A protein has these predicted regions:
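Conserved small/polar residues in nucleotide/adenosyl-binding loops
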Residues: 1-5
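Internal nucleotide-binding/catalytic subdomain
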Residues: 11, 25-165
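Short beta-strand/loop motifs in extracellular/secreted proteins, especially
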Residues: 14
Length: 165
């Protein structure tokens, strides 16, 4: 399907993601960064000119959270779920920063997450580490940084970031 047709199908509910390393600044969201389908198409063309690839995805509505899992090639040790500070300025009015930090409550929980949400995210990270080992013949060593979103339809994986890998 062509870009404009797919955007028309999604309406105002889309995200354009650079498929590559962008320092946390490759995602543009309809309504926040992109104010029309033309804006989205211009961004797509900019990415193509850079020699890059991109994804156009349906925008998910909910609360984002991250789950880091330390991997030694065999085992995973999960950190508490956290929420990222993605944007500069008060009230998240500025551009994406590429990561200013994360937070959780003093009890290491997030008020919008249930234990079942965290267990599901942990299971997804575990299954991903297992699949990487099966595909490449050796276990991943580093930090698997899963970006998730808790929606009305449940928890969904948005992306992975890899650290020290």
């Amino acid at each position: 399907m062509y870009k404009r047709q797919f955007l028309t199908l999604l309406g105002d509910n889309y995200v354009v993601k650079y498929d590559g390393l962008a320092g946390g600044k490759g995602v543009k969201v309809a309504g926040d960064h992109l104010h029309s389908h033309d804006d989205a198409l211009i961004y797509c063309e900019e990415l193509i000119k850079k020699g890059g690839h991109f994804l156009i995805e349906r925008k998910l509505i909910g609360e984002e959270f991250s789950l880091m899992s330390f991997c030694d090639g065999e085992n995973l040790s999960h950190m508490p779920a956290v929420q990222d500070h993605k944007r500069a300025y008060e009230g998240d009015t500025g551009p994406n920063t590429g990561g200013m930090g994360t937070y959780s409550d003093s009890d290491h929980k997030l008020p919008f997450l249930e234990n079942s949400h965290i267990k599901l995210a942990q299971k997804v990270n575990e299954q991903t580490a297992k699949a990487l080992k099966q595909k490449f013949g050796e276990g991943y060593k580093g930090i698997l940084y899963g970006g998730f979103i808790a929606t009305n339809a449940g928890v969904q994986l948005i992306e992975y970031n890899a650290r020290f890998g």
